[in-house]
Design a protein with these regions (language model features):
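Functional surface patches built around histidine and acidic residues
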Residues: 2-3, 21-156
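Sec-dependent signal peptide recognition
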Residues: 3-10
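C-terminal motif of bacterial Sec signal peptides marking the signal peptidase cleavage site
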Residues: 16-19
Length: 156
């Protein structure tokens, strides 16, 4: 049963990540969901944190790691750190209570941000850190160097 679950999860992840390509035609089967491909580089954009954590969980499943649960407190921490990052342009320091913190800047969508993390060896290891809860946030500052700043925090 575990092999079937892993195969299904890997298939879902492959389909989801296929949507990270630059294809700009009409929606097709397997296209990335709007919540993952919505541009965050505009005022009042709203991140679908459940879908974002779902994509991270699909990746974790391919590495035999348990899923993360979205946590309101960690979302608040992530938002405070993302806002600080967007205002100062300086990467925030990981609070000691966190298991892991991943940062990114400049990517307009979560799909692109996730692909950047997944394709960087150190960030990919961080995505599968032994944690049980997650918070994710994005902040937009059009006058800053990168415009958009992402923070993922993992905890227990």
């Amino acid at each position: 049963m575990n092999k079937i679950h892993a195969l299904l999860t890997a298939s879902f992840l492959a389909i989801a990540l296929a949507g990270c390509s630059s294809f700009s035609g009409p929606a097709s089967p397997g296209a990335l969901s709007a919540g993952l491909s919505a541009r965050m580089d505009q005022p009042n954009a709203t991140l679908d944190s459940q879908q974002a954590i779902g994509l991270i969980n699909a990746y974790r499943a391919t590495r035999n790691m348990p899923p993360l649960v979205a946590d309101a407190g960690l979302n608040g921490t992530a938002q405070a750190l993302a806002s600080q990052y967007a205002q100062t342009g300086t990467a925030p320091t990981k609070p000691q209570a966190l298991v892991q913190m991943k940062l990114s800047a400049g990517y307009p969508t979560f799909a692109e941000t996730f692909s950047g993390w997944r394709n960087n060896a150190a960030d990919a290891v961080g995505l599968v850190a032994p944690a049980s809860k997650a918070g994710i946030a994005v902040a937009y500052n059009p006058t800053s160097s990168y415009g958009i700043y992402w923070v993922l925090v993992l905890g227990n």
